[in-house]
Regions:
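Coiled-coil dimerization/phosphotransfer module
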Residues: 1-181
């Protein structure tokens, strides 16, 4: 468990540094998703279809960071386990909710079977995805069956997202916390 926590902390630092390469006040959902997908496609040679809403929602830095990791972790799971031809990331806003689906047309699995694994034995990726969704007030559920692919479904409330000024302040507080400025 300690190794997984250390890995998460290291990943948080890497993500924050990557995000700060550009103007940190301009960090937005669409470029983050496209960047993750482009890196994934380059490293995996697996095509990923991306569907985004017409209007880009403004998200708190913490929500954006966790959502970036969720998409990244779900795609890594696709690459490791799905044995698929294609994957997708679909994002839409509806009824003050951000809906994110990361899916594939792969081999699938029985989610009930995964839920029965002892803590720490396997499934850290799915557990991390669930925890990150909960940390930003969201929910996660997995839709899968053997032979039918997998869908990781995330719902995050939009009503609690701060405006840009508070979002930027929260981002800098996170940087100061991570790097001790």
């Amino acid at each position: 468990h300690v190794a997984a926590m250390a890995s998460d902390i290291h990943a948080d630092i890497r993500w924050t540094v990557r995000a700060l390469r550009d103007d940190p006040t301009q960090i937005r959902l669409f470029p983050v998703v496209h960047g993750i997908v482009e890196r994934f496609e380059r490293n995996s040679n697996l095509p990923v279809n991306v569907r985004l809403p017409a209007v880009e929602p403004t998200l708190a830095f913490d929500t954006l960071r966790h959502l970036g990791y969720i998409v990244e972790e779900a795609l890594v799971n696709v690459w490791k386990h799905a044995d698929c031809r294609t994957a997708w990331v679909a994002i839409e806003t509806q009824n003050e909710q951000l809906h994110v689906v990361i899916g594939d047309d792969g081999v699938g699995f029985d989610p009930a079977e995964v839920a029965e694994w002892p803590v720490g034995s396997k499934g850290w990726g799915l557990e991390n995805i669930r925890e990150r969704a909960q940390q930003v007030g969201g929910q996660c559920h997995i839709e899968s069956a053997p032979g039918e692919g997998t869908r990781v479904v995330i719902q995050i409330p939009l009503r609690d997202q701060p405006d840009d000024a508070r979002r930027n302040q929260a981002m800098w507080e996170e940087v100061w916390r991570l790097f001790g400025f």
